[in-house]
Amino acid sequence: MSFSNRLVIAALFSTVLVSAQNNNNSFTPRWWAKYQTLLQNGAGGAAGPTSSAPAVGANVDVSNECGPQSETFITLNTLNAKSIAGGSNEIFRDPMRGYSSSDGGATWTGVDLPLPPAIGTNGTDFGSDPSLAFDTRGNVFYSYIVVFFGHGNGINGTELAVARSTDGGKTYPSANFFSFSSGSNHFNDKPMIAADTNLNSPFRDNIYLTWDAASGGSTSGGIRFARSTDHGASFSIVRIDNPKGPGRVIAAQPFVGPNGEVYAAWNDIAANTIAFNSSFDGGVTFGTPSVIASKSIAFDIGIPAISFRRALIYPSCDADRSSGPHQGRLYCSWTDLASNGVNTDIFTAFSDNKGSSWSAPQRVADSLSGSVDRFYQWLSVDAVTGEVNISFYDTRNDTTGQRFMTDVYFSRSSDGTSWLSPNSRVTTASSNEHDCNGVFPCSAIDYGNQYGDYEGLVSFNGISHAIWTDSRDQLNFAPGCRTNLAMEEVFTATIR
């Protein structure tokens, strides 16, 4: 759809601000703001240090292009760790954006992901919700959703997409589009992808995908799991949450154990828990869903740093695939209310029996005086060292007195029982997705998306790569861009 068919930016921001402030429907699809754009034109502190302080490298602008980008993901090739691939949403354009680096994250190139033909007269479509995984053959698999709509006629449907790159993420010639669902109350949301990269696994290079098949909160919704044994050419699909449950679930993530075990965790909105299921036959069959932990925030929360989009609650999990003492241990993380009932904090739990039981939730971030929010965590277990790494947004450096400003912080644990303190600051400059030096609303901020729904982290052989939405350059003059301002960018940093 051409820019001339969309609203001018001033009208866009006023529309998004009003709709965000008045929207009390917590189950609006997370890509709704992007759709609207196109349609209209605490507790006890973390324990002491577990290792020396990490060394954080330079902050690198990965996207470096017009318009806002948000909602980031990153992965790497375990057989060539300098080959890294990432992705993000493109807010003012229709396709997804892919990023690749062949030098360990020092420099990056970008590419658009394929979209299918639109449906109907004057129809169009767009992509959202990036997730990526390498297999052991060097293929990159990039999953996302496609949302179809007719101009002025509402949503025509959604479907899943998995694109494959054979050159490290530089190009994605085609994609497999599947699981189409039609109707405004039926949509596929929040796909996450994983690959079995265990060299001795009987399911090596299987591709796994999870998402929530939302259906207006009816029992026909629920968490879907798809498996591919032919490198993404085809997928078989099963439901892995309670098939008799209310179907009010979101943000499932698949992850793989050291012997090819398949795990998935998600936010059970109705039960207000972080839920879990497992498969020991390569994703063919699953057991009965169980609970990792109860929580206080059911779906999302409007904290000052992300008050318009609101911070989604989701699990980020991984398994120890190293040969170390905790091989096979599972780790999960999530955001929830701090003990003061006001701020948000990051929690983790682990399991040594393949998810049959879990440890009591443990805080990750430093205990600080004052009011501090933490949100949008991502957890990655180093498959070589077994160390557990986590990154998250944190408002501890806010100078507005309103918890508007964020930085990305990082922590590390050898076993998930104690976390590196003090946490390490990753960002060299803070972001503010609320105002621009006190000016509110600000045309340099995409209020409908702000930080998106998550950020990313990947760790391997003692090195971690964090990726996030960054607005430090939001007011920089960018001639020829829609707002003539840089707005949100995708940044990354290497942590050793």
Which stretches of residues belong to each language-model region?
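Bacterial N-terminal signal peptides that target proteins for export
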Residues: 1-8
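Preference for short coil/turn "hinge" residues that link or interrupt alpha-helices
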Residues: 10-11, 419
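Hydrophobic h-region of N-terminal signal peptides that target proteins for export
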Residues: 11-20
